[in-house]
UniProtKB/Swiss-Prot annotation:
Gene Ontology cellular component annotations, sorted alphabetically: cytoplasm
Major location (coarse): cytoplasm
Annotated organism of origin: Streptococcus suis (strain 05ZYH33)
Domain of life: Bacteria
Gene: thrB
This protein's pathway: Amino-acid biosynthesis; L-threonine biosynthesis; L-threonine from L-aspartate: step 4/5
Protein name: Homoserine kinase
Record's keyword annotation contains Transcription regulation: no
């Protein structure tokens, strides 16, 4: 059995801790024979290979008495880069328990459990459902709206250095004034409504007008400004920080993708440029 979970790009500008999209990088969990102890085969650095692996810790939170197995973990989702690497493991752990214990969990049940573990739904929701998901987690209740993402190219610049979420959250203000919060919320509303209406020109302007987190976090990612300027000159809809960063995401018309990829590569920044597509499946069992 294989469990396949997509990468995710959260926030998308002003949709802070609420909006995310599933993208075409993947975590694959392959389950083999039963064993006396959990064995996790992988080639990831600083990741446990036993029951202390986040995958197994998550699965055991769902079903304590799971029979251990030998498992192979393969991922092309880079760690601590703002592409939902930990969220993909959490969702995979929930699905592992669901499959091994025959729990028949609904997608909404998986979402609630994943959100309780992760603390917010912006990454785990699209990892479960695929597509674009707008969600909330208030008073221990999670709500999610799944919709298609308008046709566009995602060009990701993934730096060669990590940025831990705890570090990127540390630069955020502890509070926001009422008038500013109203304005920031209005911008987020327009961004989401424009995406759902398929108006990427209007969505792009709202995405780049975020007031919740990007003005503070962009300072941690030196590549952001040159990428944004280059992408804008070539007709991109928007440039935003994926999740907490440091990955910089360019949202562009399909016919501008090649030019943007070439231009970003010619900047010779410390990282790699990737073409990504929206994943429409979410959790996949093979």
């Amino acid at each position: 059995m294989k469990i396949i979970i997509p990468a995710t790009s959260a926030n998308i500008g002003p949709g802070f801790d609420s909006v995310g999209v599933a993208l075409s990088k993947y975590l694959t969990i392959e389950v083999f024979e039963e064993t006396d102890e959990w064995v996790i085969e992988h080639n990831l650095e600083h990741v446990p290979s036993d029951k202390n692996n986040l995958l197994i810790k998550t699965a055991l939170k769902i079903e304590k008495g799971l029979q251990p197995h030998r498992i192979r973990m393969i991922s092309d989702i880079p760690l601590a880069r703002g592409l939902g690497s930990s969220s993909s493991v959490i969702v995979a752990g929930i699905e592992l328990a669901n499959q091994l214990a025959g729990l028949n969990m609904t997608a909404d049940e998986k979402l609630l459990k994943a959100t309780e573990i992760e603390g917010h739904p912006d990454n785990v929701a699209p990892a479960i459902f695929g597509n674009l998901v707008i969600s909330s987690y208030v008073n221990k209740r999670v709500q999610a709206v799944v919709t298609e993402f308008p046709e566009a190219s995602f060009v990701a610049f993934i730096p060669n250095y990590p940025l831990r979420t705890v570090e990127s959250r540390g630069v955020l203000p502890s509070q926001m004034g009422y008038k500013k919060a109203v304005a920031a919320s209005a911008i987020a509303n327009v961004a989401v409504a424009s995406l759902m209406a398929g108006d990427l020109e209007k969505a792009g302007k709202a995405i780049q007008s975020d007031m919740f987190h990007e003005p503070f976090r962009q300072l941690l990612v030196k590549e952001f400004c040159p990428i944004k300027q280059t992408a804008q000159e070539l007709g991109a809809y928007a440039t935003y920080l994926s999740g907490a960063g440091p990955t910089v995401m360019v949202l562009a018309p399909k016919d501008r993708e090649d030019a943007i990829v070439l231009a970003l590569e010619e900047l010779n920044l410390d990282g790699t440029v990737h073409r990504l597509q929206v994943d429409t499946k979410g959790i996949a069992i093979v």
